Every structure is written in structure tokens, then in C-alpha cells.
Curated annotation (Swiss-Prot):
This is Heat shock cognate 70 kDa protein 4. May function in protein folding and assembly, and disassembly of protein complexes. The keyword Thylakoid does not apply. Belongs to the heat shock protein 70 family. One of its GO terms (molecular function) is heat shock protein binding. One of its GO terms (cellular component) is cytoplasm. Signal peptide: none annotated. Pfam families: HSP70. It comes from Dictyostelium discoideum (Social amoeba). GO terms for biological process: chaperone cofactor-dependent protein refolding; protein refolding. Keywords: ATP-binding, Chaperone, Nucleotide-binding.
Length: 569
């Protein structure tokens, strides 16, 4: 059976298929387009997906959903969600139990709510249908791509969306990795190179630096922003024209959903026009209160409106190179992916930054991610025998560990560790006759857990009473190939095990937040180490005084009971 690779994009999605002979093909939809809008629309009769949904959005804006990927892994109360909602015509509400965002629509005469994952599953089902109609046979095996900086919760959301769309999700891979796979196939025989992948799509920006040597693609570092892309450029245009309309006609259109979406469509069209022309027109009959709206914008003005966003892209690239201590002149290849990399100003800025270096444009940037994902699907499902052997070494963006004595962060997996990886460490109980242990899991670069991000907790119960330091608890961190973390704790005496797959991170960490955690980790390193030393000395005195306040880490250090093992899979 063939397998497929799906680039589930914020604004457009693309699907490629790997047939039984290992041949890769990007599949066009029933409109003849090789990319499909990530739109879903509900009406009194049916649910429309893709081009059909987008084409009727002006008539049904409040029930047409798009940009849903921006809601993955976020809370309704998130300031980013609140900001996006102002320019969305559809209604987003909070789940009263967990503050997760839900989309509310009218469907067949009833009010319905859908999770972001459910909406995305409909888009995935459409991509599956496109492949099956083209091949004339069922296809269920799929590799789905995500931005490199998607956290564990967002990866779970993507995998869940695939599962409920009746896909067998072979793997979740990073978009830059998929791009690198496609690049590797088109440049067979390359070796010992530094390759920079720049992926600027509709809603996210990823940049990854790869070292290619002996067929091994090692990610040296990844960066980017999960909330930077073509949709943000559209929003800048929209806000500009909303202000212009208000200035000319003394009327605010922001509360009229139909007007907002008609303007959004016109702005998207103008943005595309400005990639090939120096001037674009906005012409919307009866936009609001019977007022026709006609205006123009130059490419120069558009570039000024988005100047800070464009420069942010350069800043992310510079950060990656600085952290890797690599001079930009030593980058051998620059590969562009994502439709927004075709904006002339973006290309010009990157070319100037890299002193005129030409980009690698061997694959269509709108299709390269799906192409690489399709290759990976073929390799996993055993149809990739004609592909060169490519080994990819992905890394963790942040350190992960548990809280120990006095709120100290004990890392089991360090930042930039290659995955998949499994690490175990043995700890001891804190109190005499302790019968349960609370495991608190954090990510971040600070010494104290209060300065890091809590991503999960669970409890190991039923521990037989014993003097403190006697009972051995083995904690295991297992990060799989998809970057998803599972943590387990085992009582070595009873063999009782509790585990949790971390899919309930309290807050989505943006690239800015992750970078801040890394910078703070370096900035406060000396101060944190001194605080840790004082805590250890304090707890040592308490231990000698026979007071029952020792925690895992101190107990295992003082009693010499710590064991650590590592297994790269």
C-alpha cells in the first residue's frame, strides 16, 4: 500500500505520496491545485473543506474556520489567542473545564463546538481523500510535519488530529527535517556541508542548521517563531486599511465579520500581487454600510508596515549562527521553504545578510515539506529502498528534569540532546516510612524549578514503609523520535510503575519564551549555582541532625545511591 507525507500548514496544506516503487509525487486536488487551503466551512447542508470552503467564505464568514493551527497547544486566555481573535470572523470560546479554545459554529441549524484538533482532522481527511481519489485505492499510512519549535503538547495535538481522521500516523517530523530530506535526495553525494533551512510559511517561521557528513544529517540547532508568517503580514495590511477606512469614512468595520473577511481576502491578494508588482489595488464594493472601498498600496509601504517582522527573521538566523559559533560565510547551502520566502524583501534581506549568496531553489518551496515527508513515509513503510540512507539526528530545544530538594532542578535530558533518547536515574525517598512520591517535571535552563516551566506531575503510591534513603525509585525520561516525552517512576522493591506521557503543558512556549529561558539560564548560572550549593550544604547539616527533610537529589548524593544510565535508540 502507498504511504503519504502531509504538510499540515496554517493557511495551505500539501500532500505527497510514495508509491510501491518508491516514487514520490505531489498530488493535485480536484481543482487542479497542488496546495489546498486549510479552511473548513459549515452551513445548513454540509461541511466544506479546502477550496470549496475558502471560495464561499465571504457569504459565510462566521462559520468558516482557518488559521486553526495557531490554536494548537494554547489556552483561550493566552494573549496571542486573544489578539488573533480580533481579526477572525469565527467565534472562539473557552472550554470551562480547562481553558482550552473551542470553535463555535452553526451547523445544520444547531450550535456546535469543535476543538482545533477536530478542525485540523477534517483538513487531514481532505488530504487523504485527495490521494485516494488520485490513486483509486485506500491510503492510511502518513507522516505529518510540524514546526521545529512545536512543543510536546502541540505535537500530541497534531498526532491526535491524524488519529481521528483515520490515519495511521507513522511519525511526526519537523518541517525543516522534511525539507532537508527533500534537499538530500536532490543533492545526492553531498558530504561535509553546513546547510541552513529557512522555512517561512503562513503562520510559523523555522530555521535549522544542519551538518551533513557521511549520510548523517545532524541538526546543530533549531530556532524560529511559532507565530510569525504570512498571516501576520496579512494582518499588518488589514490593520492599515481598517485605519484608512476609519480615517476616510469615520466608521469602524472591526465588528462586522463579513467586512473583515472580505478585507482579509483582498489583503491576501494584494500581498501576492506585491511579490510581482510594485503596486497593488484594493477594490471592495459595498464593504460597510454601502460604502465602496478603493485604495492602493506600494511594495515599499508594505515592506515598511512589516519591517520589524522581516527583521525578526534575520535576527532568528543570526541567533542560530551565533549559538553555533559559525560565521555566516561558512554556510554552504541555504534552502528556502514556505510560500512567504517568495516575498522579494525577505529574499533581498537574506541575500544581503549572506553577502549575495544564492539560494538553493531546486524544489518548489510550497511543496518541499510534503515531498520530504512523503520520502520519510516511504522509508518507514519499507518502500524507500531506492532512497539513499539518510540518518537524522534531531535535538531537544530545552533541558528536562524533575524537582529535587529545595526546588532544585535535576536534569535528566539536557538541551540539544539528540533524540530519540532514554535516560534513567535512581533516587531515594525523603522521609522515614514514606509511602508515596510526587514527581514534578520541568523544562528550562535555570537551576531552580521556580524559574522553569512545569510540564507535568504524577504520583507513585503504595511504597512499602522503610527508613529514608532505603527505598530506591528509578525515574526514566523517554523522548521518542517524534520529540514526545514519557516519564515513568518505578519502585525497585515492589516493581510498581507509574508513568505519564507529557501532553498537558500548562502554557505553550513561543520561540521568544524558549530563547529567554536559555538566555536567563546563562545569565543567572553563577547565581543559581551558588544558591544550589547553599541548599546542599544546608540539607547536609539537616541530614546530620537527623531531621526528616531530605529530598531525592540530596539523599542520593549523600548516601551514594544514584545511578544513571543513558540509551540512545
Amino acid at each position: 500500500m502507498p504511504s503519504m507525507g502531509i504538510d499540515l500548514g496554517t493557511t495551505y496544506s500539501c500532500v505527497g505520496v510514495c508509491n510501491e516503487k518508491g516514487r514520490i509525487e505531489i498530488i493535485a486536488n480536484d481543482q487542479g491545485n497542488r496546495t489546498t487551503p486549510s479552511y473548513v466551512s459549515f452551513n445548513n447542508r454540509e461541511c466544506l473543506i479546502g477550496d470549496d470552503a475558502m471560495n464561499q467564505v465571504a457569504m459565510n464568514p462566521v462559520n468558516t474556520i482557518f488559521d486553526v493551527k495557531r490554536l494548537f497547544g494554547r489556552k483561550y486566555s493566552d494573549s496571542v489567542v486573544q489578539s488573533d481573535m480580533k481579526l477572525w470572523p469565527f467565534k472562539v470560546i473557552a472550554n470551562k473545564f480547562d481553558d482550552k479554545p473551542l470553535i463555535q459554529v452553526d451547523f445544520k441549524g444547531e450550535t456546535k463546538t469543535f476543538s482545533p484538533e477536530e478542525i485540523s482532522s477534517m483538513v487531514l481527511s481532505k488530504m487523504k481523500e485527495i490521494v485516494e481519489q488520485h490513486l483509486g485505492e485506500p491510503v492510511t499510512d502518513a507522516v505529518i510535519t510540524v514546526p521545529a519549535y512545536f512543543n510536546d503538547r502541540q505535537r500530541h495535538a497534531t498526532k491526535y488530529a491524524g488519529t481521528i481522521s483515520n490515519l495511521n500516523v507513522l511519525r511526526i517530523i519537523n518541517e525543516p527535517t522534511a525539507t532537508a530530506i527533500a534537499y538530500g535526495l536532490h543533492r545526492r553525494g553531498i558530504d561535509d556541508m553546513k546547510v541552513l533551512i529557512i522555512d517561512l510559511g503562513g503562520g510559523t517561521f523555522d530555521v535549522s542548521l544542519f551538518n551533513i557528513e557521511d549520510g548523517i544529517y545532524e541538526i546543530l540547532l533549531s530556532g524560529g517563531d511559532n507565530h510569525l508568517g504570512g498571516a501576520d503580514f496579512n494582518n499588518r495590511l488589514m490593520n492599515h486599511f481598517i485605519d484608512e477606512f476609519k480615517l476616510k469614512h469615520k466608521k469602524d468595520i472591526t465588528n462586522n465579520q463579513r467586512a473583515i473577511f472580505r478585507l482579509r481576502t483582498a489583503c491576501e491578494r494584494a500581498k501576492r500581487t506585491l511579490s510581482i508588482s510594485s503596486l497593488a489595488s484594493i477594490e471592495i464594493d459595498s464593504l460597510y454600510d454601502g460604502i465602496d472601498f478603493y485604495s492602493t498600496i506600494t511594495r515599499t509601504h508594505f515592506e515598511k508596515l512589516c519591517s520589524d517582522l522581516f527583521h525578526s527573521c534575520i535576527d532568528h538566523v543570526e541567533t542560530i549562527l551565533n549559538k553555533c559559533k559559525l560565521d555566516k560565510s561558512l554556510v554552504d547551502e541555504i534552502v528556502l521553504a514556505g510560500g512567504s520566502t517568495q516575498i522579494p524583501k525577505i529574499q533581498r534581506m537574506f541575500k544581503e545578510y549572506f553577502n549575495g549568496k544564492e539560494f538553493n531553489n531546486s524544489i518548489n518551496p510550497d511543496e518541499v515539506v510534503a515531498y520530504g515527508a512523503a520520502v520519510q513515509s516511504g522509508v518507514i513503510s519499507g518502500k524507500g529502498s531506492n532512497f539513499p540512507q539518510l540518518i537524522f539526528l534531531n535535538v531537544t530545544p530545552l533541558s528536562m528534569g524533575i524537582e529535587t530538594v529545595g526546588g532544585i532542578m535535576t536534569n535528566l535530558v539536557e538541551r540539544n540532546t539528540h533524540i530519540p533518547i532514554k535516560k534513567t536515574q535512581t533516587f531515594s525517598t525523603q522521609y522515614d516510612n514514606q509511602t508515596n512520591v510526587l514527581i514534578q517535571i520541568y523544562e528550562g535552563e535555570r537551576t531552580m524549578t521556580k524559574d522553569n516551566n512545569l510540564i507535568g506531575t504524577f504520583e507513585l503510591n503504595g511504597i512499602p514503609p522503610a527508613p529514608r534513603g532505603v527505598t530506591q525509585i528509578e525515574v526514566c525520561f523517554d523522548v521518542d523520535i517524534d520529540g514526545i516525552l514519557t516519564v515513568s517512576a518505578e519502585d525497585k522493591t515492589t516493581k510498581k510503575v507509574q508513568k505519564i506521557t507529557i501532553s498537558n503543558i500548562n502554557d505553550h512556549l513561543s520561540k521568544v519564551e524558549i530563547e529567554k529561558m536559555i538566555v536567563d539560564g546563562e545569565k543567572f548560572k553563577q547565581q543559581d549555582q551558588q544558591q544550589k550549593k547553599e541548599l546542599i550544604e544546608s540539607n547536609y547539616k539537616i541530614y546530620c541532625g537527623d531531621e526528616n527533610t531530605l529530598d531525592f537529589e540530596i539523599t542520593q548524593k549523600l548516601l551514594g545511591s544514584a545511578q544513571s544510565t543513558e540509551m540512545n535508540e
